[in-house]
């Protein structure tokens, strides 16, 4: 892992342990059971492929470690509306709080206003996070192979599928791509 990714993962481990002290898995499962706003991310893309249309996944993020703050007056709903008005296929919402200044709440806010599938873009290292993302309305997750080992990636992938979520796997090297395709 590179230096910034190491920092993000270490912070993410701390954050997850803190959240688990206050939020039970059963509470998340109850919230998921009551939510009917889930949309099929993968199906939306496949429908475009079948109809020979391009699929655009539009990213919503406030900041990044490399770029700093991108939007001073960041309004995820306003950005999502602009993308929706321009007929994007799906949305990718960056939810990592410390380095990208995101929030899972942004997914919930967007899903209440816009009927597009939403990918939760975060640093997934624990299945608990998948339940969190789903409880806020995420339809898909991103697994970044550079941040976790292959066994954990497979566990996260299977957990997301159990929750009827789509999964996008991000690789940064040829070796990671080969592992992802196993």
Describe the residue ranges of each PLM region.
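Active-site-adjacent beta->alpha loops and helix N-cap segments on the catalytic face
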Residues: 96-114, 122-131, 143-160, 175-179
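Conserved, mostly hydrophobic/aromatic
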Residues: 8, 58, 83, 91, ...
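Active-site mouth loops of central-metabolism enzymes
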Residues: 57-75, 117-125, 166-171
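N-terminal amphipathic alpha-helix/helix-capping segment at the start of soluble metabolic enzymes
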Residues: 1-61, 66
